[in-house]
Amino acid sequence: MAIIIPSRLSSTRLKQKPLQLIGSITLIERVFKQVNQAGLEHTYVATDSEEIASVITKVGGKVIFTDSAIPTGTDRTYEAFKLIPNNQNINYIVNVQGDMPFIEPSSILKIIEYLKNSKYDIVTPIVKVDRESVKASSNVTVVVDSAGTALYFSRSLIPNGAEEFLYHVGMYGFRKNALEKFVSLKPTFLEKTERLEQLRALENGMTIGTCLVENVPISVDTEEDLKKAVKFYENISKLGL
């Protein structure tokens, strides 16, 4: 089992996003520390940046350098996976986005549990939310069948007319052969239209299972998101959490 956190220094909406401070600690360090609490031996940050690498190694983390030209987080995850020593013994890979500073380790463990106890190619977490919680265009919703198998992901609110939705949390657990297959596939029409790479898997007949988790994690993509993350940190610090 390996957890890989892709983290690229360049960001279009928030300059040097991984190095932005939340309190006295950078975003990427907070993500790493949360993920590391899952207690798995193979936890890596995959990056193109010496600065990010320095932050992670100073707190005892492991780094794998990947090319800055790699187009997606999943592609970066696979490139990093190939460089893990003795990776032939690793059968499951979890891709955790590097912009969720308060991600709950229990969500990662739940992904792993679902992967091991199902036949899905990919497993990803979801949260039940109301309409007010998913108004932002950056939010992604998903529709599933009665068994929890993902049918479609969208940046639009789906299903249309509903008052409760399934919010998609941007983490993916892959079987090794599924990750290898995914990166071998070309970007698809729906993937490019929605700007959601998981649709590449669905369009090519791969199965994505969903596991229900309790909380929507804060994700930092913009300056406004960063302010919210800082405010959240200040609030939990006051409570001693």
Swiss-Prot record:
Keywords: Cytoplasm, Lipopolysaccharide biosynthesis, Nucleotidyltransferase, Transferase
UniProt entry tagged with the keyword Cytoplasm: yes
EC number: 2.7.7.38
Pfam families: CTP_transf_3 (PF02348)
Catalysed reactions, as listed in the record: 3-deoxy-alpha-D-manno-oct-2-ulosonate + CTP = CMP-3-deoxy-beta-D-manno-octulosonate + diphosphate
Location of the protein in the cell: Cytoplasm
Keyword Cytoplasm: yes
GO biological process, alphabetically ordered: CMP-keto-3-deoxy-D-manno-octulosonic acid biosynthetic process; lipopolysaccharide biosynthetic process
Gene Ontology MF: a single term: 3-deoxy-manno-octulosonate cytidylyltransferase activity
SUPFAM superfamilies recorded: Nucleotide-diphospho-sugar transferases
Superkingdom classification of source: Bacteria
Main location: cytoplasm
GO CC list: cytosol
Pathway listed: Nucleotide-sugar biosynthesis; CMP-3-deoxy-D-manno-octulosonate biosynthesis; CMP-3-deoxy-D-manno-octulosonate from 3-deoxy-D-manno-octulosonate and CTP: step 1/1; Bacterial outer membrane biogenesis; lipopolysaccharide biosynthesis
Family named by the database record: Belongs to the KdsB family.
Function recorded in the entry: Activates KDO (a required 8-carbon sugar) for incorporation into bacterial lipopolysaccharide in Gram-negative bacteria.
Protein name stated in the entry: 3-deoxy-manno-octulosonate cytidylyltransferase
Species of origin: Rickettsia rickettsii (strain Sheila Smith)
Gene: kdsB
